[in-house]
Amino acid sequence: MISAAAFSHSASRGSTGSRRSANSRHSASSRHSAHSRRAARSWRDAKSRRLAVASLLTTSALLLAACGDESPASDETSNSAGASAGSAGERRGEAPATEQAVGLPLDAPRIQVLSTGTGERKLLSYNDVSSEQAVDIEVSEGFQQLVMKNDQLVTEAPELGDLVTTTLPVAGSVLVPEGFTDSTPGADSARHVDFRVRDPHISGIKTSTSSADDAGLNAAGLAEEIASADGFGFGWLAENNGQLNTLLLAAPQQAGDQARAVVEQSLTKLVSTPVIFPDEPVGIGAQWSVDSRVTGEATMLQTTTFTVTDISGDEVKLDISVEQRPALGALSLEGHAGAEGFADDTLNVTSTDTRSRGSLTVDMKQPLPVAGELDFTTRVVYGNDDGAASVVQDSSTRMRFSSAQ
C-alpha cells in the first residue's frame, strides 16, 4: 500500500503555482528523492531522444543519397510467464518491500460536453471507495521515425505497427485519502486508488545489431529483469468524476533500473487516458471531450472523446476516439550529424493525423475499466519549404483491460 507516511512529492513542469508553493514546503530529503528520480527519467528521455535523432539522421542520409540497404535482421524475445488469476486480496499477498512513494502532480484536464444524449439521463461518477479490484492490463507502445521524399509523402496515420507490450496483472483497493499533508498535491481528493503490480512481463522486444549496444538494451535480459518489478506500487489521488490529481509510484527495492523504467513508462501511459465523466447527467449517445497533455517520445496535446453506448446500473459502455498534436511546433536538428541533408536546421510541423478506435466497459464501483481496448496511432510530419524530404514520426499505443477471474 502507498501510504501518506511513505510519500514524497515530485513536482512536474506543468504544475500550478499552488503546487509549486506546496513543493517548497517539503523537506530537503523529499526534494532530493524527487529530484533524483526526475533526473534519472530526464537522462533516460534525453538518451532516447539522442538515439532517435541519430537514427533518424542516419536514415535521412541514406535516403537522400538514394541508398537502399535494408536494416539488419531483428531478434524478438518475449517472457511467456502468464498473468496469475485470483481475487485482489490473493494477488496482493506478500508483496516485496517498496521504496518511498513518489507523487507526480497531473495537470487538470478540460472537459466539454458535446451532447447529453437521449432518454433517461444519469450523473455518472465513481462510487468505489472501500472496493477491491483485480484486473489484467496490457500496455503496448511503438515509435518509429523515418524520412520520406516529399513527392512520396503520406500524411495519414498508419495502422498499429510493431509494438512492445508490457503485461501488468494488478490488484488493489480504493481508500479515502488520509494522512497526506496540505503540501501534497491532491491531498483533498475524494479517492485514493492503491494498486500493486504482480508478475509483470514484456513481449515484442526488438533490437537491431547496430543499435542494441548504443541503446543499452538486451532483449533477453530485459525480459528476465522485468520480473524484478514484481510488487511495484502505484495509484493516484482523484475526484469522483475520474479526474486524476496526482500519480503515485513506489518501485520495489529489488527492482532493476530497466525494469523500473519499463513499468514506470507503462503506468504513465496508463493514466494518460483515464475515463473522466462530465459533471452533468447524460444518457445514451452522450458525448464529451477531455483535453489533456501527455508525455512520451514527445509531449502531445490530446483530445479524448467519449460516447455512451449503454448504461446498465453501475456499468457504462463507452466508445472512445483520440486525437493528438505535438505541443511544440518544430523539430530542431541543429548540431546533429546528417542535418546537412535538410535545407534548414529547424523543421516545422506540416501535418498531424491520428487513427484511433476503442471501446471500454466501466464499472463505477471499480477504479479501472473491467473490459475493453483502446488503440491509436499518431503521425506527425515535419518539413520546410525548400526541403526535398520530410521527417515522419509515428507513435502507437494500445491498452487492453480484462477482469481477473
Describe each region flagged by the PLM.
Residues L63-A66:
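C-terminal motif of bacterial Sec signal peptides marking the signal peptidase cleavage site
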Residues A5-T16, S24, S36-S55:
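Bacterial N-terminal signal peptides that target proteins for export
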Residues A220-V262:
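Hydrophobic alpha-helical segments and helix pairs
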Residues M1-H9, D69-S71:
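N-terminal acidic, proline/glycine-rich, low-complexity intrinsically disordered segments
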Residues E264-T273:
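Short, structured beta-strand/loop micro-motifs enriched in basic residues and often containing a Trp
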Residues G68-D213, A286, V290-Q405:
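Acidic, serine/threonine-rich low-complexity disordered tracts
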